[in-house]
Every structure is written in structure tokens, then in C-alpha cells.
Amino acid sequence: SGGLNASMGTFARDSDFIPVYVPQPQYPRRAQTRGKEGYAVVEVIITTAGGVRDPKLLEELPEGWGFGRAAVKAATKLKYNPRVIDGVGQEVPGVLYKFSFNMDK
């Protein structure tokens, strides 16, 4: 059972990042009035405190309707439980988040 205790100890000190707050992006007005739906994928760096920085738009479909801009703006408000290794928060680069824009049916 000594092995079990050791692994539980490690588990408590190490944890991966998990989203704890996902903001609702602002639906682009022109897309909304035309009934357009789409999505955008944003890449962020999760900070040691669980915030995000440097959001970059990677993909937007369909293009030109403002989904990308709205997603990047929303991404700045994402909150995560940060990745923790040996009890220390780690910065995590290259994390992707997909925002979907769907009309309420």
C-alpha cells in the first residue's frame, strides 16, 4: 500500500489545466441578422495563475462575418485551473479553444 500513498501524493501535487470559466462570445451583429452560424478556433497561452494571454486566431469559418474577432475577444476572458507540477503552477503554450456560434432555434 506504500506505492498507493506515493502515487496519491503525486496526484495531489500534479494536476492538468481545466477550463473553469468559458465566456459567451458576442454574436457578430451582421451574422446574427443574416442567420449565419460558424465557429472560430483560438490559440492561447495559459498563465501560471490560470488566466490566458496572447490569443491568436487560427481558424474562422465562414470568414468575414466577425466570428474570429469575437472569439479572440472572448478568449481573453477564459479562466483555467492552471497546470500544476510538484505544487508549482506551469505556463502552458499552444492551447486551442473552439468557440461555436449557433443561432437559438
Predicted regions and their residues:
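Hydrophobic residues positioned within well-ordered beta-strands of beta-sheet architectures
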Residues: 1, 40-42, 95-99
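A short, well-structured alpha-helical segment
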Residues: 17, 36-41, 47-84
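Residues at secondary-structure transition points
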Residues: 8-9, 41-44, 93
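Cysteine/selenocysteine-centered motifs that mediate thiol-based redox chemistry or coordinate metal-sulfur cofactors
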Residues: 82-104
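Generic alpha-helical hydrophobic packing signal
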Residues: 17-23, 55, 92, 96-98
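A generic structural micro-feature
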Residues: 32-36, 72, 89-93
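Acidic, low-complexity proline/glycine/alanine-rich linker and hinge segments
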Residues: 1-33, 69, 73-79, 105
